[in-house]
């Protein structure tokens, strides 16, 4: 979201605050990724009725209650009979009965209102989409030249998506792969190997998969990231009620705490701070929960119990020994220096 001028302004503000606080602040830039949307309707909105038929096609004609343009030929190339399409964050569900290279005739499984340019998800297939759109490529080059720390890739499906982005980034930023599609879950081990970090983006993941599948997937992905020594972020709808309320629900607080107890390296706000009415309170709440959990003796016990077998390298042995010394003697700082660099 936002123009390059707006992004440059936000970047400058963050760096100014960083200097004022004399504390490093990492900046993560989130690329939009391939967004799939339907076209427009003559009336702006139509009501789809369960059991009736609805067509998606490439025609330029304005949408009606019976059909609408879906300007993505790559979707039709990948569809098959029995495949599902989810529209408007999964509120509308269609099942493909017949399809060709420029159309899909569907039955309406879950009905409701459909309006102009609503998003489309296709959970059953790997779409032949480029990992980066032309807009993404332009944005990527701009923000890397601006000077960011992390780059988040949206809707990755396979390891090749990250490799393509890495070649363009060329070491100017570290790459976070957002796991928000079933295909990414299936290919997670390969994606993890070529990523600098992972974001468990539960929003779209919960649209394309049954919602009850998301918590165990979150737990498994976090554990795999810890085992691989890769940072992992848990994101989306963590304090969703704070978009409109100054206080979170108890369930939301528990959800945030659970993500921390699982071993997440970061917990992330979305609409709460980007578009909500109480952004400062949301950040304060998130921070307070993190401080409380990490000061709980149970947290240390859980992290210790979940530690995997040590690796056998000399570096891992040194780090493990330093950790034991720090814990045993209650050190507040470990000083590390290299001959070719300034002490850090």
What kind of feature is each model-predicted range?
Residues 128-236, 242-253, 260:
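Conserved alpha/beta-domain cores
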Residues 33, 38-140:
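Beta-strand/loop-dominated core regions that host nucleotide or nucleotide-derived cofactor-binding catalytic loops
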Residues 1-11, 150-158, 205-210, 271-279:
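Glycine-rich, proline-tolerant flexible connector loops at the mouths of alpha/beta enzymes
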């Amino acid at each position: 979201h936002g123009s390059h001028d707006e992004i440059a302004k936000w970047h400058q503000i963050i760096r100014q605050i960083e200097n004022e606080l004399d504390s490093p602040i990492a900046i993560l830039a989130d690329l939009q990724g391939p967004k799939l949307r339907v076209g427009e309707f003559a009336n702006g909105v139509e009501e789809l009725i369960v059991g009736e038929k609805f067509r998606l096609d490439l025609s330029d004609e304005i949408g009606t209650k019976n059909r609408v343009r879906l300007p993505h030929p790559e979707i039709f190339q990948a569809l098959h009979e029995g495949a599902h399409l989810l529209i408007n964050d999964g509120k509308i569900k269609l099942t493909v009965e017949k399809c060709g290279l420029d159309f899909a005739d569907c039955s309406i499984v879950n009905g409701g209102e459909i309006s102009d340019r609503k998003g489309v998800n296709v959970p059953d297939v790997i779409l032949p989409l480029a990992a980066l759109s032309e807009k993404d490529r332009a944005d990527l080059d701009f923000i890397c030249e601006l000077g960011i720390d992390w780059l988040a890739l949206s809707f990755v499906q396979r390891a090749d998506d990250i490799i393509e982005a890495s070649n363009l980034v060329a070491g100017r930023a570290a790459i976070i792969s957002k796991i928000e599609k079933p295909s990414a879950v299936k290919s997670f081990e390969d994606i993890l190997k070529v990523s600098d970090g992972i974001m468990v983006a539960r929003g779209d993941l919960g649209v394309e998969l049954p919602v009850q599948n998301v918590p165990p997937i979150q737990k498994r992905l976090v554990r795999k990231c810890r085992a691989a020594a890769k940072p992992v972020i848990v994101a989306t709808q963590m304090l969703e009620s704070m978009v409109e309320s100054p206080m979170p629900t108890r369930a939301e607080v528990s959800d945030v705490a659970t993500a921390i107890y699982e071993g997440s390296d970061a917990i992330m706000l979305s609409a709460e701070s980007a578009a909500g009415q109480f952004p400062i309170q949301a950040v304060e709440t998130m921070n307070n929960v993190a401080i409380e959990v990490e000061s709980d003796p149970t947290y240390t016990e859980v992290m210790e119990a979940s530690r995997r077998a040590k690796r056998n390298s000399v570096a891992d042995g040194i780090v493990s020994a330093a950790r034991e010394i720090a814990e045993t003697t209650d050190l507040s700082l470990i000083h590390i220096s290299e001959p070719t660099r300034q002490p850090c």
